[in-house]
Amino acid sequence: MDAHLENGAGIDVVLVTGLSGAGRGTAAKVLEDLGWYVADNLPPQLITRMVDLGMDAGSRITQLAVVMDVRSRGFTGDLDSVRTELATRNIAPRVVFMEASDDMLVRRYEQNRRSHPLQGDQTLAEGIAAERRMLAPVRATADLIIDTSTLSVRALRETIERAFGGGASATISVTVESFGFKYGLPMDADMVMDVRFLPNPHWVDELRPRTGQDPAVRDYVLGQPGAAEFLDAYHRLLSLVVDGYRREGKRYMTIAIGCTGGKHRSVAIAEALMQRLQAQHGEAQLSVRVLHRDLGRE
């Protein structure tokens, strides 16, 4: 059984927050579809009251998700007090922080022709920057950070479902994400590894148009001197980290593997690493998926 359910007298609490335009509404809809009771834009001081109602005998609320944003007065300061107050009820709420790159947020606001809640007389970019600064302390203590910059609605739904669709699951959810350094670092990565030390298939004419998912490219990358040794060593390191996460009660982990463009080397290594993690730990202990962030961008 989920530790949050065991400690919380039968109620699991998730606080969904993050940057405006990063997908809080979509996350809320997915949670609602999964059977969670969702309260949107509930002021922090009313959260404990809602939890108390859910803990009352006869209440059918066992999974409560609260969507919060900076328009709630005293948001950042009150959030800590809410967590402290819930701790007195033996409830440790999980905080989900939604974010996206500045460029993507600007694009979304321009497409929807909406103003940012903190924009005021400033530019849209300045409003986004102000919110990012304001929410930095919240992001630093979040249990799960979801970067929606390159996620489709379907991919976001799958991410939420994996994290919260099985309330009784005690597995650790691991995402192995390939990316290209020239497109920037993944904002939600817990660990980043650079595999540009391996020869680049881009310079092999017959391999250039293919990707790291192609058997010929995979064999080329994994057959390079040092590739197998690197996989062995990095897999051992990740196994230690996974065990540490489990001891600390953490449930989510994103491992980013980068090469120049995110097309060949990082893709092949990410696929191989995912297979090794699955083979060693099994689905009962580890839920592993692979995500190729920049595949198809070239």
Swiss-Prot record:
Q: Annotated Gene Ontology MF terms?
A: ATP binding; GTP binding
**UniProt keywords, alphabetically:** ATP-binding, GTP-binding, Nucleotide-binding
Where does the chain bind GTP?
69-72
- Superkingdom is Bacteria
Q: Name one Pfam family in it.
A: PapZ_C
InterPro entries linked = P-loop_NTPase, RapZ-like, RapZ-like_N, RapZ_C
Binding locations of ATP: 18-25
What does this chain do?
Displays ATPase and GTPase activities.
Q: Which family does it belong to?
A: Belongs to the RapZ-like family.
Which NCBIfam families does the record match to this protein? PRK05416.1
Recorded protein name is Nucleotide-binding protein MAV_3359
Name the species this protein comes from.
Mycobacterium avium (strain 104)
Q: What is the lineage of its organism?
A: Bacteria, Bacillati, Actinomycetota, Actinomycetes, Mycobacteriales
